[in-house]
Amino acid sequence: MKQTRTAARQSRHQRIRRKVKGTSDRPRLAVFRSHQHIYAQVIDDTRHHTLVAASSLEPELRQKLGKGSTCAASIAVGRLIAERAKAAGIERVVFDRGGNIYHGRVKALADAAREGGLDF
């Protein structure tokens, strides 16, 4: 029987998570994309601790962007997560695309985070 899109994404994400681990030296930049918003977290998997987070739900971004489901919103979240990570002393991360295809909003967030100074 054919998998649904959500089930296929979840199985891809489980496969990725077996390989991608965030450490205190190089934490994991996890991206979650919903229909209306995009979320990014920098996570230390050894301590099970979220170090930095940003999303398109944040008030300053919502006022500027309006909709959180656009590539412009993803770029803004990518810049914000890079800025917050740099402030927390994080330079290098491991990218976790969350089972999503590296295209569109996920790619826009990753490119903006790279431009903001994160190395991955």
Swiss-Prot record:
<comment type="subunit">
    <text>Part of the 50S ribosomal subunit; part of the 5S rRNA/L5/L18/L25 subcomplex. Contacts the 5S and 23S rRNAs.</text>
</comment>
<comment type="similarity">
    <text>Belongs to the universal ribosomal protein uL18 family.</text>
</comment>
<dbReference type="InterPro" id="IPR005484">
    <property type="entry name" value="Ribosomal_uL18_bac/euk"/>
</dbReference>
<dbReference type="GO" id="GO:0003735">
    <property type="term" value="F:structural constituent of ribosome"/>
</dbReference>
<keyword id="KW-0689">Ribosomal protein</keyword>
<keyword id="KW-0694">RNA-binding</keyword>
<feature type="compositionally biased region" description="Basic residues">
    <location>
        <begin position="10"/>
        <end position="21"/>
    </location>
</feature>
<protein>
    <recommendedName>
        <fullName>Large ribosomal subunit protein uL18</fullName>
    </recommendedName>
</protein>
<dbReference type="InterPro" id="IPR004389">
    <property type="entry name" value="Ribosomal_uL18_bac-type"/>
</dbReference>
<keyword id="KW-0687">Ribonucleoprotein</keyword>
<dbReference type="Pfam" id="PF00861">
    <property type="entry name" value="Ribosomal_L18p"/>
</dbReference>
<dbReference type="GO" id="GO:0006412">
    <property type="term" value="P:translation"/>
</dbReference>
<feature type="region of interest" description="Disordered">
    <location>
        <begin position="1"/>
        <end position="25"/>
    </location>
</feature>
<dbReference type="GO" id="GO:0008097">
    <property type="term" value="F:5S rRNA binding"/>
</dbReference>
<dbReference type="GO" id="GO:0022625">
    <property type="term" value="C:cytosolic large ribosomal subunit"/>
</dbReference>
<comment type="function">
    <text>This is one of the proteins that bind and probably mediate the attachment of the 5S RNA into the large ribosomal subunit, where it forms part of the central protuberance.</text>
</comment>
<keyword id="KW-0699">rRNA-binding</keyword>
